[in-house]
């Protein structure tokens, strides 16, 4: 969600205990080897969290230094209040997770607390599927972190679920989070990136001796994936293991319950860029479960991210963030008609109304549209496609917005409430029309005479006087 540094997504959660982190793990890019070292968001977070009072001559200096460190981490000059809040909530959420899950979630680099929850729910569903069930006393529900331990790693201590120290730096480069020692070494590496390169070079001679220990030192990621994959039914196992045949390292065979024979060893560390998560609807594959979850919303029409200001809903948190800026910041992109926008792309779409530019044309009737989405929705008129069906009465709709509005007839829900007078509405368009009564906004502009209107219907009535179809109101 925020910033990617050194080619890796920042890990916002707490760092595992120092003795479990292992040697310094830093991914070095070519430009860094030339002398350009870019500090990570995680490093700034740790500097802020681990700052000590004894490092300053007095309380005022300590407070001043804390403010500087906090700004370096949260970057309030570029991040919104909501982004900063989400960062803090995600950090605390990862802090309260059991150790068995904490580092596993960090491995997937969630962009928000909601995405971290989705990862855990996906993992829990994996473990609840047939073939993953572990015998438990009646009426006792085990949490997901206990299911992980009992479904394949019960013989291992909780500490074994944490990433194990490796003898070389490069083994974590493809998927490990960026951890920087908070000591004098940090300053040395920050001032001279060549030391990072020396660290990597000095360990290359030890690789041959470490290869036999690699399966035991793969750490948390290998343990979790082996538990999930090894316990799946055979049909699902074949699907999950696509493109894993070329993996070098394998985990020792796992013993099945009640069986003396161990299962065949399966690859545990996925190949970089491998797409193991497959959509059941269209077959599209993804490299992590969070991207699959986002993709599924294109089929379900789900929009879980709702703007608290106007009630508009979005399928992705990033789209909500962009939208929310329209409520918080100035709108620097002005149109000659006086309407302003927070993004240049919105201004371009709006200007097509003045120029009558409509680059997207329907092949059946020739009608043109300014946006591709409008053309897709229009085309369903010709095909008769109505993919959105109401579960209550079976009525179908060509657009998800139509289904959402219809479902409120069953529930009686009116989520759009006016803060000025308290009146509630079941549809955002009705709410927006009403809200213009209070603001006096008239966003619909006649390009013939320049007169403005508060609703599109009033503009259409007015334009008839120019086309000769009727008189203006």
UniProtKB/Swiss-Prot annotation:
<feature type="zinc finger region" description="C2H2-type 5">
    <location>
        <begin position="388"/>
        <end position="410"/>
    </location>
</feature>
<dbReference type="GO" id="GO:0007283">
    <property type="term" value="P:spermatogenesis"/>
</dbReference>
<dbReference type="GO" id="GO:0000981">
    <property type="term" value="F:DNA-binding transcription factor activity, RNA polymerase II-specific"/>
</dbReference>
<keyword id="KW-0221">Differentiation</keyword>
<feature type="zinc finger region" description="C2H2-type 1">
    <location>
        <begin position="277"/>
        <end position="299"/>
    </location>
</feature>
<comment type="function">
    <text>Strong transcriptional activator. Plays an important role in spermatogenesis; essential for the progression of meiotic prophase I in spermatocytes.</text>
</comment>
<protein>
    <recommendedName>
        <fullName>Zinc finger and SCAN domain-containing protein 21</fullName>
    </recommendedName>
</protein>
<feature type="zinc finger region" description="C2H2-type 4">
    <location>
        <begin position="360"/>
        <end position="382"/>
    </location>
</feature>
<dbReference type="GO" id="GO:0030154">
    <property type="term" value="P:cell differentiation"/>
</dbReference>
<keyword id="KW-0677">Repeat</keyword>
<dbReference type="GO" id="GO:0007141">
    <property type="term" value="P:male meiosis I"/>
</dbReference>
<keyword id="KW-0469">Meiosis</keyword>
<dbReference type="GO" id="GO:0005634">
    <property type="term" value="C:nucleus"/>
</dbReference>
<keyword id="KW-0539">Nucleus</keyword>
<keyword id="KW-0863">Zinc-finger</keyword>
<feature type="cross-link" description="Glycyl lysine isopeptide (Lys-Gly) (interchain with G-Cter in SUMO2)">
    <location>
        <position position="232"/>
    </location>
</feature>
<dbReference type="GO" id="GO:0006357">
    <property type="term" value="P:regulation of transcription by RNA polymerase II"/>
</dbReference>
<keyword id="KW-0804">Transcription</keyword>
<feature type="domain" description="SCAN box">
    <location>
        <begin position="45"/>
        <end position="127"/>
    </location>
</feature>
<comment type="similarity">
    <text>Belongs to the krueppel C2H2-type zinc-finger protein family.</text>
</comment>
<feature type="cross-link" description="Glycyl lysine isopeptide (Lys-Gly) (interchain with G-Cter in SUMO2)">
    <location>
        <position position="27"/>
    </location>
</feature>
<dbReference type="GO" id="GO:0001228">
    <property type="term" value="F:DNA-binding transcription activator activity, RNA polymerase II-specific"/>
</dbReference>
<dbReference type="InterPro" id="IPR036236">
    <property type="entry name" value="Znf_C2H2_sf"/>
</dbReference>
<keyword id="KW-0832">Ubl conjugation</keyword>
<dbReference type="GO" id="GO:0008270">
    <property type="term" value="F:zinc ion binding"/>
</dbReference>
<feature type="compositionally biased region" description="Basic and acidic residues">
    <location>
        <begin position="258"/>
        <end position="272"/>
    </location>
</feature>
<feature type="zinc finger region" description="C2H2-type 2">
    <location>
        <begin position="305"/>
        <end position="327"/>
    </location>
</feature>
<dbReference type="InterPro" id="IPR013087">
    <property type="entry name" value="Znf_C2H2_type"/>
</dbReference>
<dbReference type="Pfam" id="PF02023">
    <property type="entry name" value="SCAN"/>
</dbReference>
<dbReference type="InterPro" id="IPR003309">
    <property type="entry name" value="SCAN_dom"/>
</dbReference>
<feature type="region of interest" description="Disordered">
    <location>
        <begin position="244"/>
        <end position="272"/>
    </location>
</feature>
<dbReference type="Pfam" id="PF13465">
    <property type="entry name" value="zf-H2C2_2"/>
</dbReference>
<keyword id="KW-0479">Metal-binding</keyword>
<keyword id="KW-0805">Transcription regulation</keyword>
<feature type="compositionally biased region" description="Polar residues">
    <location>
        <begin position="148"/>
        <end position="165"/>
    </location>
</feature>
<feature type="region of interest" description="Disordered">
    <location>
        <begin position="127"/>
        <end position="167"/>
    </location>
</feature>
<dbReference type="Pfam" id="PF00096">
    <property type="entry name" value="zf-C2H2"/>
</dbReference>
<keyword id="KW-0862">Zinc</keyword>
<dbReference type="GO" id="GO:0000978">
    <property type="term" value="F:RNA polymerase II cis-regulatory region sequence-specific DNA binding"/>
</dbReference>
<feature type="zinc finger region" description="C2H2-type 6">
    <location>
        <begin position="416"/>
        <end position="438"/>
    </location>
</feature>
<dbReference type="InterPro" id="IPR038269">
    <property type="entry name" value="SCAN_sf"/>
</dbReference>
<feature type="cross-link" description="Glycyl lysine isopeptide (Lys-Gly) (interchain with G-Cter in SUMO2)">
    <location>
        <position position="349"/>
    </location>
</feature>
